Amino acid sequence: MRTKYCGNIRIIDLHKSVILCGWVHKIRNFSQFIFIDMRDWTGIVQLVFEKKNNKVFTKAVNLKNESCIQVIGIVKKRNANNNNLDTGEIEILVNKIKVFNISKNLPLDYSNNSNDDIRLKYRYLDLRRSELLENLKIRNKITHLIRIFMENKNFLDIETPFLTKSTPEGARDYLVPSRNYPGNFYALPQSPQLFKQILMISGIDKYYQIVKCFRDEDLRSDRQPEFTQIDIEASFVSSTKIRNLVETLIKKIWLKVINYNLNKFPKISFYDSMKRYGSDKPDLRNPMEIVDISDIVIEEKVASFFQINLKKKNRIALLCFGQGNKISQKKIDEYSNYVKKFGAKKLFYIKINKIENRFQDIQSSIKNILDKNTLENILRKTNAKNGNILFLLADEEKIVNKSLGMLRIKLGNDFIFFKKNTWKPVWIVDFPMFKQNSDGKFSSNHHPFTALKKNNQNKLEKNPNLAISDSYDLVINGYEIGGGSVRIHDAKIQKKVFNIIGIEKQFQREKFGFLIEALKYGPPPHAGIALGLDRIVMLLTNTNNIRDVIAFPKTTSANCLMTDSPSKLKKSILNELGINILKK
C-alpha cells in the first residue's frame, strides 16, 4: 500500500517514484498549484498538485484537513528549503491520489491547546498531534529498555491476577461483582504487593512486571485511577541491593532517552529531609534549605511573642532567600498569608540591606525582640549576604516544617533561580514505621508489610511511634517516582504489625489469612520496589500532566469522555449480579 513513510524521504530519494499514505495536515491553494502537507506518524512531507493534471487537482480541491489519503508521486527538489521540516529539501509532485476517507469539520483546533474536555472526547484526533505521538514513542522506548535491563539481570516477567481479593491498602478499591457468587466481589489490585511476596515464598528468586494498577482516589495532574507500575521484587537481598539495581536502571533510561548522565543518587533519611526541606519529596534543584535556629533564639524568651505553646514539640527555623531585593512588602504579606494555609500563625522576616552595618541596615518584623548578639549568630549560621531576606517561623515542629517546605517550593516557582533542565534524584530512606492519627491510633506509613530497620524490634513492642522501617522512596525533581522496602518475612511480626494498626484477628484471617499461612512455610528474606512508569515518562517528556503520556486517560473526576464511561447498566444485568442501586 506504501513504499515510504512521509517523514523518511530525503534528498537521496530525488526523482524516485513513491507511494505514501497518511493524513492531510494543511492545505494551501494557489489557483494553479495546491500544496498539501501530508502527515503520518514519522513526520510531514509537502505534496504538490498541478492544475494541468486535472484529475488529481480536482480531488485535491475537495480535500479537508485530517482526510485520509494515498498518493503516488515523484520526489522533487524544493525551490526553497524549509528548515523546520526533516523533509524540507524535497517535495512530492503527485500524479495519482486515492481518497480513503474525507474528514468531517474538526471539533478541535490543532494550532492551540483546545479545551481539555474536547481533547479527551475526541482523543483519536488529539493523538494525531505530533507531541502526543512523540510521548507515546518515548513511553514505548522506556518500557523496551526496562524489559531488556530486567531480562539481563535474570528477572522473570510474571503476570499477577487482576481479579483478586479486596484488602485495606489505603485508597479505595475498584470492585467487580461476581455473577457466580452473588453478594461477593473481586477487587482490581492497587498493586501486586501480596502476589509478588507470595512469588518470593514460592521460590521465584527475581520477579518484575510492568503492570496496570487501580485506585479509586481523588485525582490530580500526576494521578490517574488506572496507572502503570514497574514492579520489582527479589529474594535474599538488602534494601541497598534494590536501590543499587534501580539506580542503575534509572541512569540507563535517562542516558538512552535524553542523553543525560545522572550522578550518584544521594541518600537522606526521612527525618533529615523533613528538617532540611520540609518535605519527604524534596526538589534538590532548589538549593535553599531550612536552617534551624532553635539553639540561637531561646524558645522560653520568645514564647509570648511567637505565641508558642511550650508544652508542645516546637521549632524555630528559617529560609534564607538570595533575591531579597525583589521581595516587596506586598510580596511578604502574600507569603505570610500563604503559609497560614499550612497552620502557621505568622511569617516573620529579616531583610539585609548592608550586612557590614549589621543592625542599622536591617529591616525586620522582629527587630525589637532580637538583641545584637542573637542577630549576629543568626547571620553567621545562615551565611546571609547583602540583599538576602530571611523568612522565619516559630511554631510546632510539624507546622514549621510543612510551612517553610511549601514556601521553599513557592519561592522556587516564583523566581526560578535554578536550572530547569537539570535532574536531581535522591533516595529518601528510613521512614517511620507508623503514623499516629489525631485520635492516637496507628496506621502504616507505607504499607503493613514493610519490615523494621535493624535494632528496632523493641520499639515495635514498647514505642511503635518511634519504630523505623527499612523503606525507601525515589524522588526526582520533587516527584516521587517510586517506593519500596524490605518486607516482613516472619508471621509473628506480621501479626504484631496488624495488631498495632488496629486490624482485628478475625479481619486478619479474612483479608490476609493466605499471606500469614504462607509465611509459615519457610519464607525467604525479600525486598522490592514499585516505580511509576507514567510519572517517569511525564518527567522525560517535560509535560505537566500525566494525561499527556497515557493513550486513553481519564478526567480528574475519573470519567472517560470518549467512551462515556462509567455508564449505567440495564436492570436485568444488575438483577443477574444481585445488585440493587440505592438512590442518594
UniProtKB/Swiss-Prot annotation:
InterPro entries for this protein: Aa-tRNA-synt_II, aa-tRNA-synth_II, aa-tRNA-synth_II/BPL/LPL, Asp-tRNA-ligase_1, Asp-tRNA-ligase_1_N, Asp/Asn-tRNA-synth_IIb, AspRS_core, GAD-like_sf
Gene3D superfamilies: Bira Bifunctional Protein, Domain 2, GAD-like domain, Nucleic acid-binding proteins
EC category name: ligase
Entry keyword set: Aminoacyl-tRNA synthetase, ATP-binding, Cytoplasm, Ligase, Nucleotide-binding, Protein biosynthesis
Catalytic reaction equation(s): tRNA(Asp) + L-aspartate + ATP = L-aspartyl-tRNA(Asp) + AMP + diphosphate
Binding-site residues for ATP, renumbered to this chain: R215, D216, E217, Q224, E480, G532, L533, D534, R535
Pfam family, one: tRNA_anti-codon
Alphabetical GO biological process terms: aspartyl-tRNA aminoacylation
MF terms in GO: aspartate-tRNA ligase activity; ATP binding; nucleic acid binding
Stored SUPFAM superfamilies: Class II aaRS and biotin synthetases (SSF55681), GAD domain-like (SSF55261), Nucleic acid-binding proteins (SSF50249)
EC number in record: 6.1.1.12
Keyword set includes Kinase: no
CC annotations in GO: cytoplasm
Subunit structure: Homodimer.
PANTHER family in UniProt: ASPARTATE--TRNA LIGASE, MITOCHONDRIAL, ASPARTYL/LYSYL-TRNA SYNTHETASE
Function per UniProt: Catalyzes the attachment of L-aspartate to tRNA(Asp) in a two-step reaction: L-aspartate is first activated by ATP to form Asp-AMP and then transferred to the acceptor end of tRNA(Asp).
Family membership noted in the UniProt record: Belongs to the class-II aminoacyl-tRNA synthetase family. Type 1 subfamily.
Designated name of the protein: Aspartate--tRNA ligase
Source organism of the structure: Buchnera aphidicola subsp. Schizaphis graminum (strain Sg)
Gene: aspS
